Amino acid sequence: MKQKFLSGVTLAALTLLVALPLLFILLQAIFPHFSAGSLHDAFGGVWPLLADPQLPSMLGGTLWIAGGVAMASVMIGLPLGILRGMFSLPLPWLWDLLFLIPFLTPPYISALSWMLALQSQGYLQQLTGWQLNDLLFSRSGIVLVMTFNIFPVVYFAVSRSLLASGQRLAMVARVHGASAWRAFWHVTLPMLSPALAAGMLLAFTLAIEEFGVPAALGSRAGVVMLTVGIEKKLADWPVDLTGAALLSLLLMAVALFAWWLQTRLVGEKEVTSVTGKPGENRGASLGWMTLPALLVMAAVGGLAVGVPAVSMMLTSLMGTLSGGVSLENVTLRHFAALFDQQGDALSALGVSLSLALGSALIVGALGLLAAWLVMVQKIKGRGVVDALSLMPAALPGVVVGVGLILLWNQPFWPRSPYNTLWMLLLSYCCLLLPWPVRYVGSALRQLGPNLEPAARVHGASPLRALRLIVLPLVFPALLAAMLMVFAVASRELVTSLLLSPAGTQTVAVFIWRQFEQGSVGQGMAMASLTLLTGLVLMLTALALMQRSTRG
């Protein structure tokens, strides 16, 4: 009975967080007057959208940018991942940490940092006399800025696949007369292709849902992506709910197609490289090529991490931008202002930390239950639970925001969370639910199949077995996922912009508004503290994951 109750509660929560927002997007897209309680004029909003002269440029710009980011991420992440996974490099953990930082840095902060560094009269021109303003504010510039944030997904997919599979099959090919290049081309690369395809398509998905970079750089580059178009339809008067819903469906269709293609490519190609007890993968020696390889990795790290970080810190320490880079212009007043009780910074920080903590606790519990019900209990309808719990991984944040607005801004609700902080909590929980589901699911796969049945034989109920057997074993992975959720939720931008109540700011909204108001130094000071906090949480999560793996 308790198991059925938990199954019902889990399914109800998933319906509330995921299914209903998507349903209301679909209803608003079909019925233009649905928000007013009318179902007439079905599909009346489709033709005006198709006739919109901006639609081809928005869709084309989205696909062009996302395709460019995916290709550029492969061009950078593939060789770096091969160097990390196949060869013995000094301080390998340091390179992993270095390439983790760009993924941790909020893309909109990176975009603003690059803008301050490369634009006319930016830091590069002040220090060297050069400026790359035309490159930055172009399609290629947007692709480069987004790539430096996203390429780590390819790097980690490739390097982890190589580290897990080892090089024994390639060594067998070498023993039988194959050259090093032939062994790589015919053995290693085909084994690597599922991970490479997954990383590339994940990079594509992350690019199409990005809002901050195209919003910061796109207007001056003449590029409008679907995410920016959706936000404008909700922010500009008169509000176009039907247009926002239709664009959300279009963006969701592109994201789901990429997700489906990734699933097909990875799911249909199964490669077995380790049977029995795995051996230790020490990696081959690069010999005299070690130094050039390290220089290449350091150069990429310097561009992806060093330039935005230096730009961010310079801005936070400069009294005024017009004062330029000089010792006389150095000040700590922007950091001091963050702790001024009269300002909004502490309030924004408190709101973000509270929402992030609430999101981590809720999705941690819900993700644990969903993974346990699907993988261990194998309940009826587990396919629905599994699909709903993982679907947000393919949903852009702006789509989730639109769905929640359409769901809760309806007159028939007796009480609604609309225009309250509960809306932000719902959006964060929806977006970040896949993290604990995947982490706990991976941990559950590593458990022996006889642990819970043994507890059941000795009289333990399913819930007691979950509490006393399963939870202690998967807790490190669950805690790592919750820390990741906390770190990401504390700097989420697009849903915060769409759903924040009037007069309330999160850290992301505070930073964005500071730039809009010209208080760049204070915005970058807050960004620096946010990045440092996220880095500490990420390192803690990695340590817990390694502990779980060793256990």
Summary of predicted features, one role per range:
Residues 2-35, 51-163, 191-212, 216, ...:
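Membrane-water interface segments at the C-terminal ends of transmembrane alpha-helices
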Residues 59, 177-178:
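Polytopic alpha-helical membrane proteins, predominantly small-molecule transporters/carriers
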Residues 173-174, 455:
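The alpha-helix within a helix-turn-helix
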Residues 41-51, 184, 330-340:
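A short amphipathic helical element positioned immediately N-terminal to and/or at the very start
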Residues 175, 544-551:
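Short, charged juxtamembrane terminal tails flanking transmembrane helices
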Residues 212-238, 324-328, 493-520:
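Glycine-rich helix-loop "coupling/hinge" segments at transmembrane-helix boundaries
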Residues 170, 452-453:
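Short alpha-helical segment that forms part of, or immediately flanks, the ligand-binding pocket
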Residues 166-167, 182, 219-227, 231, ...:
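Feature of multi-pass inner-membrane transport and sensor proteins
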